[in-house]
Amino acid sequence: MRKSKVLTKALAAILCIAMLIPMAVTGGAAETGSEPQATISVSTKRLSMTDQREVALSFNLGYKPEAANLEWSFGDQPFSQWLNWEGDDGEPVFTVKDLTIADNGDVTATLCVDYLFDGDDAAYWRPWYSYRGEYALTVTDKSTGRSASQTMRYEVYDSYTPYSELDSKIQEIIRTQTNGLYISYESTGLSTDGKDVMEVIVARDKAVVDNYLALLKRAQTEPEAVAADVRSGRLSDYQVPVYITNIHPNECPAVDQQIEFLKAVATQETIPYLNGDNETCTYNVKDVLNDVFFIIRPTENPYALEHYQRGNVEGFDLNRDSTYQTQIESQVATADLVKWKPVTLMELHGFIYYARTQLQIEPCTPPHEPNLEYDLFMNYALEGARAFGDVASMNSIYNSSSEYAKENGATEDNQPWYDITMEAGYDPATGRYEYPSDDMSTNYTPTYALFHGTIGYTVECGENNEASVTMGKYGLIGHTAYVAENKNGLYLNQLEFFRRALNNEESPETEKWFVTQDNQVEENFREKDEYGKFYPEYYVIPTDAASQRDIADAYFMQEYFIRNGVQVEKLTQDVTVNGVTYKAGAFVIDMHQISRSFANAVLYKGKIVKNWTGLFSESVTNFPELRGFDCTPITQPGVFEGKTVDANTVERGTAWVTTYGTKATVISNNGLDAVNAVNDLLAKGVTVGFITEAGDHYSKGDFVIDYKDVAQISDQYVIEITHVADVPQARVITEPKVYVDDDSFDRFAFTRQMNFKTVADVSQANVVFSSNEPEEDVKAAVANGLPFVGASVNILEYAKATIPGFDFKIQWIIEEGMYGPEEVYNDYEALFNVEYGDSLITASYAAAGDFTTYTKGGSIISAYPQEATVLMRASSQDDFYKAGWWNGIDDPDGVLKGQVVAIDYQSGGLDMTVFCTSITNKAHQTDDYRLATNAIYSKLLGADFTVSDAGQDEPVPSSPRTGDDMNVVAWIAAAVLSMGMAAVFTTRKKAR
């Protein structure tokens, strides 16, 4: 579901308060104040918040008590304090009936347990997690003080698996399996906080797994030959993987659905189930495993499972990071997916509220990401989805016979009742996709899988209870049975994906799926080059400083592509194409490879999405522009043939050093490695200057240090260093102490990606950065002169209230909800060209010829005081808009074109830089980070920069060289304060 606006914030606030206040009811695992003298015997020690049940109990206090004297408690609260959440007048959760007292003191009774909430669903906004745990069920004779007790386990539903028990539960299933299967259970990597990301493989035998990996290696190089073997029957005894995973473990049933499925296939030879026609079928485990094997990953996010939240320890939603891969968990997950290249992937989620059904399964509505071979996906996607949905629905309470289904339009009993996302979003009456739920973003795991030839599904269960666990378990039974039955067709379909990619071939059948919201094929959705092709022949990423603005990013991309299964080559000689010479050592991505869809999705400029009423998430990926490196598509065939070697081993880049003298050393302000180097130097007490005037061999906005200080960073950073014979005009930077609030993107960017010294107390800061409206103490500090740098639509109200004459406009999106109320939000995004004012803040961008920026939020600065300096405005050129989704952006009256998007204001005791553009969104737009860092450095300038007398003034020019003594800094990702509780989703769509 889309992140909520007003309703979501209110619900989230209620949830947080409920989770933080001391528990008035439960008291955790309660103590009665004295050691119980007797034990209560019970028929079950496990109680559920979402299930009504009766528990037989008995005890003996050593004498015959009076019934009127018996008092009951659960935890440290009497039964009378346990009322379910139905408002002010909730019903008792615990009651006792059928109390019988024998003459010998034997007492028997029935404990009646009602729902903790107002039904059988512990919805995501309800603080059920605070109630789970062990409690003492105690009965006390108030006349004597004697008591009996039993420790009870109280969970949200019976099969719920907390993180602390996940490993032992899986190990127990493996230990007690009865089907003689090969079951491996291994770590595939570590999460940011150091937890194992575990994977279970279930196969007929180990040879199945080994043979598949060998077959996959062959299939990726000669798919036509493998396909011929399948068609002829020469290849018949082979098995293909079905990949099952979860990324949001706060959607609890999604974890337990996998565990219960694993338990079933490990311990039952056959599993009866109902199909979509209400017929009884048999799932024979060994027969199924003759055609498939299972890769089960209970969660990609163990920290979130441990702490009941959506994001990882950094607070990032990993299901918006599958391609950006700023987070370690995303890197682990995608590398494993690329290793196996399964035929299908089921990513299990929850929840959908205010929906027609309690189960929703992809495929998505349009618009579809242009690099997806959608015709191949759709050959089997709908059938595979229905195989899951039919069996899930018919073998749970969530079929057409349910009260919920009847309330939402079901007219017949015992029928499947679920939605296919693509179909649910389409209105036959209007012929439009009235409720789009798209896969335009590259960052969902199932979409990522599609780039690699895997049919990926997001599956949304409806509720947080045992019934949803059962539904998901049976859905997996239905889907895996379908894959086994259709193994050859599915595998041939994947082999066709490989063949098409290896030949860099394009099919007109794909383009039929790229339609408008009115369901009409959109002409030129895949923009074509001069040869009439969408995919280029090559991409070139230079590695020399003359051709590459950020060498560090060039080497980062090599590592990134290798991790994601993209084949990388390197030029062995200089090659000139269209008058441009690409130097030996440049990385080359030949698009004749099976990962060409993914490579192109990462490197191409992006798509302008026109006139859709809604998109689910960011549509712009464009690594060259958002990360900030030079990359050129080459459309001519064969120009690099015989001129490259494989470069599929990660290389460590080196600094690019040019010497013209030894008076001072200039560090080009061209990327994150430069920022990290400067912050490292400042932390060591080294004097660093911010160059205020351009000169020979350096630009305004670069950094300068004394020549003798370069050894302080000589082995760490891939930066461009120029030793010069003069001392550039510069001012000394005071080490920043940046106040950053708890925004996950900001904290990750400033601590992990840029190595700033950050403080949590604004009184200790010498500058503030924020992407959100500041707290009152921060506002007060800024009003008293503390420099402030703000970026994003979220700080504009504060800027308006603080800067005289400042105003802004937001283009709001108003969207009718499919199931709930109208939504109003501001998710428009754009990759666009800008014009810069003369400022230290933008000087390094202007010097590099980097006139492209990105924004998320759909806003402009409409007014500003005369004293302000305009830093950036959107270009007035007709082609300024490069990619994104912003309806009306290219209208004649100019929603964005020519408008101001950043100012600097220093007047009246205020020192504020305001960007209405985003800067740290998803920690992906790192090329824009230096707008913030330049603003910060510019506000902390002191005396003129000077150097010591050592060194020579005479120029000593030398040819530019790369030095083996300067190594690349590792790409940084690790812990920040978590987002906290589970994100609360809107009342409209699925929580992707």
PLM regions and their residue ranges:
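Intrinsic-disorder/low-complexity accessory segments
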Residues: 33-172, 188, 196, 219-252, ...
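A cross-kingdom C-terminal cell-surface attachment/processing module
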Residues: 967-989
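Bacterial N-terminal signal peptides that target proteins for export
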Residues: 2-14
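Sec-dependent signal peptide cleavage junction
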Residues: 21-34, 959-967, 988
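Hydrophobic, small-residue-rich alpha-helical packing segments that form membrane-like cores
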Residues: 276-285, 293-398
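C-terminal low-complexity, Ser/Thr- and acidic/Pro-rich disordered "stalk" regions positioned immediately N-terminal
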Residues: 945-964
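A short loop-to-beta-strand scaffold at the N-terminal edge of the catalytic core in hydrolase folds
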Residues: 195-201
